[in-house]
């Protein structure tokens, strides 16, 4: 289960962002993940909440934005969004496609309470 490893690294990034922006508590964060990462959102949420106990992110709301796989056909130039891992052009059926989206895995934003009020930080 690589979700626990991702959650642990995510919590490290959140702690760094909180320190950098003088946040005493993190209330919400947004994580963007591509379909090619094979991350199970429910497993990641469970790991995040379990590993986050006792950290600056304890009780924070984790928003996961899932990015579908998108490809461009090198034969006809069409762009398609894939529903599964069949890397075929949606227009002409060619196998020669380039992945445009779906590899993402990044912390997009962090929101929390500053030591003297409220604040927000970009990941």
List each language-model region with its residue ranges.
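Short functional micro-motifs and their immediate structural scaffolds
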Residues: 81, 94-98
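Extended interfacial segments that mediate partner engagement and assembly in macromolecular machines
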Residues: 2-15, 39-41, 55-63, 67, ...
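Short, flexible, mixed-charge glycine/proline-rich loop motifs
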Residues: 61-69, 78-83
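Short, low-complexity, polybasic intrinsically disordered segments
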Residues: 41-52
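Short cysteine-rich clusters marking metal-coordination/redox-active sites
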Residues: 73-76, 89-92
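Amphipathic, hydrophobic secondary-structure cores in small proteins
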Residues: 5, 25-31
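Phosphate/pyrophosphate-binding loops at sites that engage ATP/ADP/AMP, CoA/4′-phosphopantetheine
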Residues: 16-25
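Cys/His-enriched microdomains
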Residues: 71, 87, 105
């Amino acid at each position: 289960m690589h979700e626990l490893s991702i959650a642990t690294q995510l919590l490290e990034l959140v702690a760094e962002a909180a320190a950098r922006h003088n946040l005493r508590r993190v209330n919400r964060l947004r994580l963007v993940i591509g379909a090619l990462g094979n991350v199970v959102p429910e497993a990641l949420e469970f790991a995040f909440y379990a590993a986050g106990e006792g950290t600056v992110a304890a009780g924070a709301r984790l928003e996961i934005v899932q990015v579908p796989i998108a490809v461009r056909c090198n034969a006809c130039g069409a762009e398609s969004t894939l529903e599964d891992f069949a890397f075929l052009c949606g227009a002409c059926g060619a196998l020669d496609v380039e992945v445009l989206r779906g590899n993402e895995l990044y912390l997009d934003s962090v929101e929390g309470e500053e030591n003297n009020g409220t604040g927000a930080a970009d990941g």
